[in-house]
Amino acid sequence: MIAASIKAEVVKDNARAANDTGSPEVQVALLTARINELTPHFKTHAKDHHGRRGLLRMVSRRRKLLDYLKSKDADRYTALIAKLGLRK
């Protein structure tokens, strides 16, 4: 789990309004933070298959949110992936 202070910072950086916690941008940013925190764990614990399943679930959920955002507003989608560095 990510620390509350890091989570609050991620929400503040990606929120569209003052108390925005549910927009796709915030959800994708939080999932990205959790994924980035878990990724090094699997470099040292390669046989943690149950944990890997959770990671793949998060990646899949992030992909679905990004697909939704792309279909609704392509400009916000491109800005978000550039900000988070998700695509090359």
Curated annotation (Swiss-Prot):
* Function as written in the Swiss-Prot or TrEMBL entry: One of the primary rRNA binding proteins, it binds directly to 16S rRNA where it helps nucleate assembly of the platform of the 30S subunit by binding and bridging several RNA helices of the 16S rRNA. Forms an intersubunit bridge (bridge B4) with the 23S rRNA of the 50S subunit in the ribosome.
Q: Which UniProt keywords apply?
A: Ribonucleoprotein, Ribosomal protein, RNA-binding, rRNA-binding
Give the lineage: Bacteria, Pseudomonadati, Pseudomonadota, Betaproteobacteria, Burkholderiales
Q: InterPro entries annotated for this entry?
A: Ribosomal_uS15, Ribosomal_uS15_bac-type, uS15_NS1_RNA-bd_sf
State any GO BP term from the record.
Answer: translation
Which Gene3D superfamilies does this chain map to? 6.10.250.3130, S15/NS1, RNA-binding (1.10.287.10)
Q: What is this protein called?
A: Small ribosomal subunit protein uS15
Query: Which domain of life does the protein's organism represent?
Result: Bacteria
